[in-house]
Amino acid sequence: MFVKCSCIWYNKNMEKNMFNINNNELSYGRGYVYSLQYHLVWCTKYRKKVLKDGIDAECKEMLCDLAEEYKFQILAMEVMPDHIHLLVDCRPQFYISDMIKIMKGNIARQMFLAHPELKKELWGGHLWNPSYCAVTVSDRSREQVCSYIEGKKEKQ
């Protein structure tokens, strides 16, 4: 038999502490409850330091626009000269690989249009390295990840 407790379903035989989730941090969909946060990192091609001198601010603005359009939240963000750190909260309908593809593709297209000089520095026509890092974030590690991301720019 299942019992509903604080918007989380669990079997009576399970311990209540097993679901140590703050209800304020849960998101609700039609028929489901979720909390999905990822720490995402991706680098420029050849680790070239091209995300600087105002381009970093444009990149942040583009990421915020994409978050609004695709309905995910950016909890923390830092654009470094050669890579990007994001902490995102997203819906379960999106594959994280698709989200990253959308972000990298849209930003590259807009950056190359606005800054044609980037193509000269990044021969081959690619702004981003094809790889990325995506790590799930728990309630316990979220504060550490936020502090890490926010502290990246200060260390430069």
Residue ranges and their predicted role:
Residues 1-156:
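Basic nucleic-acid-binding interfaces
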